[in-house]
């Protein structure tokens, strides 16, 4: 089993490296956003010294022009970035981040931002076109109690789209 953890920016820059060293005992794949976003120099130092990979998540939110994206990636140089298309300019904005990261040897994966199954379906189908090699974070649709049924289902550790299942009548569902 490969585990990723998310600190959601909870560590202080002062004690983050010590916490990362302690967490490294668990042979984690990576940690997301160990310190609060906006601390580029401190995050860069962590990415350089961390005993295991760091993935940026919240750090990317609100950075929507190519020059700033390049500046962030070259300043911090994380091992991974995590893309939520709904928060990064849609599919086009996410593809730009992926391209810029790949040019710099930085990996990536896609997650959802708690979209309904309609949005999750679109993100999942786009993500499949990327031919990902890492597990993606798209299994969130089952968290909702009032979500439109869609031909998506989890089987094992994969999210599947079943083309034999008829897609729902969205307008009818909205009227309910």
Residue ranges and their predicted role:
Residues 1-121, 125, 144-155:
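Catalytic core of soluble alpha/beta enzymes
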């Amino acid at each position: 089993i490969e585990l990723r953890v998310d600190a959601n920016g909870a560590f202080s820059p002062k004690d983050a490296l010590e916490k990362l060293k302690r967490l490294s005992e668990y042979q984690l794949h990576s940690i997301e956003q160990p310190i609060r976003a906006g601390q580029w120099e401190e995050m860069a130092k962590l990415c350089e010294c961390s005993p295991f990979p760091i993935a940026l998540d919240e750090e990317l939110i609100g950075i929507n022009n190519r020059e700033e994206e390049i500046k962030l990636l070259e300043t911090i140089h994380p091992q991974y970035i995590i893309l939520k298309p709904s928060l990064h300019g849609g599919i086009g904005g996410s593809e730009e981040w992926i391209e810029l990261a790949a040019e710099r040897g930085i990996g990536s994966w896609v997650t959802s931002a708690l979209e309904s199954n309609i949005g999750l379906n679109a993100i999942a189908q786009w993500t499949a076109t990327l031919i990902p090699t890492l597990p993606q974070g798209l299994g969130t649709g089952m968290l909702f109690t009032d979500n439109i049924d869609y031909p998506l289902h989890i089987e094992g550790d994969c999210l599947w789209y079943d083309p034999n299942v008829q897609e729902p009548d969205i307008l009818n569902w909205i009227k309910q």
